[in-house]
């Protein structure tokens, strides 16, 4: 088990990933889930190496990533990220599932897959795990995931992302979501005022390259969205920043 040092707002040593996420989630708004983006980037701003964010991470980040998931009702993610990052069972260890049950949550978090076209192959690990519940959030009026999917699959066909996120609260009871990207999904959520916090890992790596993929795609934000630092932790040279997203 990796250890973290809290650097801000005060110093504390020897913390575990569970300690770091103990205050999560925040208070949900009245009409939608509380949403945090959980992202990683190299020191020069790249959100992936060789196409995968997982190639940037270390063991401490892996533990914090899964500890964050385990505090949430659901995981919001784009279909391409699921394919590239090889998603499987949402809560991947028994102790975390047991903690969730003790805290009144289902053993596994719900996966919310945001996709313009309903297109995931049957061999994706997320669909092969019978314990998973998958909600497909899509503007498409047709299309379904492969019938041989072992996971429980539901569809939320909604052309407006903000309305879709609100329906996740009203119709599916999801009060807290972690969004794991990718950048285009992030760029849809943030300008729409649907994100409450950004959890950003700064990796001590330089990747280089032309036109690097960053954590936020889409058009340039004008004006930029302002952030407030809530906590800052360190482990193995990696920095783990938790920001509040300022509302307009």
Where are these regions (language model features)?
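Enzymes that bind and transform nitrogen-containing heteroaromatic metabolites
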Residues: 1-248
